[in-house]
Amino acid sequence: MIYEICANSYESAKNAEAAGATRIELCSELGVGGITPSYGLIKKVMDELSIGNCVLIRPRSGDFTYSEEEFDVMLRDIVLCRELGCQGVVTGVLLHDNTIDVERTAKLKEAAGTMEFIYHRAFDCTPDPIVAIKTLKKLGVDRILSSGGKKSAIEGLPLLKELQRIGNGKPMIMPGGGINAESIVQIKAAGFVPSKVAVRMVTCIPCGITHCP
């Protein structure tokens, strides 16, 4: 089982490493669902810790439809993460109808280079998750974080299992949302090897999903 922890500070990243977590999703401002952490925080974690570090790329709170200027910031942040040697980036971009923004997602993935490219729970806002996973599969996304469209991954297990079947490991489906020591047993029983464990859950995005992106 792979354990990933949302870390919103150097201290929480250090604690996650000490507790034996496999990797972290580094972000700031969990109170609004997480936004891109500062360059200084990313560099300190990369310089001083050995835990795998996937960085959230989200320029602001709110929805996942971004202006040209916001998108440019996202591209620049991804390049910085690549230059610092981060394991991956966690991001997501939607069109105004909440479908996957194919063109921009492709550009973000290209900017990521050889880093892992993880599509976050913006996925759970899409109107048709089956179409969405097929789209992301064509784009070569490595992982998708999802609660199966529900407030918790346990509630969303039926859809998560179907997504896992369609993805067939590429992209890998990572259950996220409301996961704790008890629910991990159910997640494993459903056939999922990796599972995202977020230390705090918040509600921030328009579709009302309780999450850490």
Question: Which residues does each PLM region occupy?
Answer:
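Catalytic cores of alpha/beta
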Residues: E11-A19, T65-I78, D124-L139, L160-G169, ...
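Residues at the C-terminal ends
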Residues: A18, D47-E48, E83, E110, ...
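Alpha-helix-loop-beta-strand connector modules within alpha/beta enzyme cores
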Residues: G34-S61, I100-A122, E155-A181, P213
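Hydrophobic faces of well-ordered beta-strands that scaffold small-molecule active sites
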Residues: Y3-A7, I24-L26, N53-I57, V89-T91, ...
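Active-site mouth loops of central-metabolism enzymes
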Residues: M1-S9, I57-L75, L94, F117-P129
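N-terminal pre-domain/capping segments
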Residues: M1-I24, E29-T36
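Glycine-rich phosphate-binding active-site loops on the catalytic face of alpha/beta enzymes
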Residues: T22-I35, L80-H96, V141-E155, A190-P213
